[in-house]
Amino acid sequence: MDRVPFCCLLFIGLLNPLLSLPVTDTGERTLQLPVLEEDALRALEELERMALLQTLRQTMGTEAGESPGEAGPSTETPTPRGSMRKAFAGQNSNTVLSRLLARTRKQHKQHGAAPECFWKYCI
């Protein structure tokens, strides 16, 4: 009998902080950013996307055996950090994508004149 009031007091003591929190109806209000911040976020996302694409093109151009100076027509593009980066124009996006996918493939080592090979396992 002694434990029932103690459990009730403990329960009320633990429940009190939860009841003191304000309850807001989130269904009525939505978070609305000011127009200026929204435009700034869009511009930043566009700059990041452009910088990533240009970096990808640079990487694919140098992997193809070209040095960055020989790559052909280039333009100055801004990066999200505000610096200017040379980017190569005129490359086909399918070429860039195929080079990227080819780079991620696993390169299998060619064994020399292995005398005993069964399927893909060589001794």
From Swiss-Prot:
GO biological process: blood vessel diameter maintenance; negative regulation of blood pressure; negative regulation of glomerular filtration; negative regulation of heart rate; negative regulation of insulin secretion; negative regulation of urine volume; positive regulation of angiogenesis; positive regulation of blood pressure
Primary location class: secreted
Signal peptide range in chain numbering: 1-20
Organism whose genome encodes this protein: Mus musculus
Record region (Disordered): 57-88
Keywords on record: Cleavage on pair of basic residues, Disulfide bond, Hormone, Secreted, Signal
Protein family per UniProt: Belongs to the urotensin-2 family.
Propeptide residue intervals: 21-104, 107-109
Name this polypeptide is given: Urotensin-2
InterPro entries noted in UniProt: Urotensin_II (IPR001483)
Function: Highly potent vasoconstrictor.
PROSITE patterns given in the database record: UROTENSIN_II (PS00984)
One term of GO molecular function: hormone activity
Location within or outside the cell: Secreted
Disulfide bonds: C117-C122
PANTHER family: UROTENSIN 2, UROTENSIN-2
Cellular component terms (Gene Ontology): extracellular space
Keyword Signal among UniProt keywords: yes
Tissue: Brain specific. Predominantly expressed in motoneurons of the brainstem and spinal cord.
